[in-house]
Amino acid sequence: MSTAFAAAVVKQKVEAPISPMDARIDELTDYIMKTLLWQFHSRSWDRERQNAEILKKTKELLCGEPVDLSTSHDRCYWVDAVCLADDYREHYPWINSMSKEEIGSLMQGLKDRMDYLTIHRLLNEELSDKHY
C-alpha cells in the first residue's frame, strides 16, 4: 500500500449507516429542539409526561385519529400537538404520504430520541431533585 493511499484512508471519516427512518427522526428532533420551548420543563418527570402526551397527540392528529380532550392537561398538550402537526405537515411534506403505521413508528422513535436528549442523557441533577 502506498503512503499516499494510506494517508487518504486515515483521513477518511467513517460514519455508521443511517436508515431513512433515523434521518427523518433527526429532522423532526432538530425542529423541536430549535423551535419549541416545551422540552425545557424543569423536572424530568414533567419532561417525560410532556414528551409522551404531546407526541402521542401529534401522532393522533397526523393519523386522523380521535384525540382525548377530556382534561385540562389533555387540552394543553393538544394545543402544542396541533401546532407541531401543522408545522410538520408544512415543513416536512414527506410525512403526508406516510401510512399510519409508519407515522406511529416515526413518532415513537421521536419520543425515544426526545426522552434521551432531554432527560436520560443530561447530567443536570436538578431534573431529578424531588424538592425542586
Curated annotation (Swiss-Prot):
The EC number(s) attached to this protein equal 1.18.6.1
Renumbered to this chain, the signal peptide range is: none
State the Gene Ontology BP annotations: nitrogen fixation
Provide the alphabetized UniProt keywords: ATP-binding, Iron, Iron-sulfur, Metal-binding, Nitrogen fixation, Nucleotide-binding, Oxidoreductase
Q: What molecular function does GO assign, one term? A: iron ion binding
InterPro entries cross-referenced by the UniProt entry: Nase_Fe-Fe_dsu, V/Nase_d_su
- Catalysed reaction equations from the record: N2 + 8 reduced [2Fe-2S]-[ferredoxin] + 16 ATP + 16 H2O = H2 + 8 oxidized [2Fe-2S]-[ferredoxin] + 2 NH4(+) + 16 ADP + 16 phosphate + 6 H(+)
The cofactor(s) it depends on are: iron-sulfur cluster
Q: How does it assemble?
A: Hexamer of two alpha, two beta, and two delta chains.
Its biological function?
A: The key enzymatic reactions in nitrogen fixation are catalyzed by the nitrogenase complex, which has 2 components: the iron protein (component 2) and a component 1 which is either a molybdenum-iron protein, a vanadium-iron, or an iron-iron protein.
Name under which the protein is recorded: Nitrogenase iron-iron protein delta chain
What taxonomic classification does the UniProt entry list for its organism?
Answer: Bacteria, Bacillati, Bacillota, Clostridia, Eubacteriales
Q: Which gene encodes it?
A: anfG
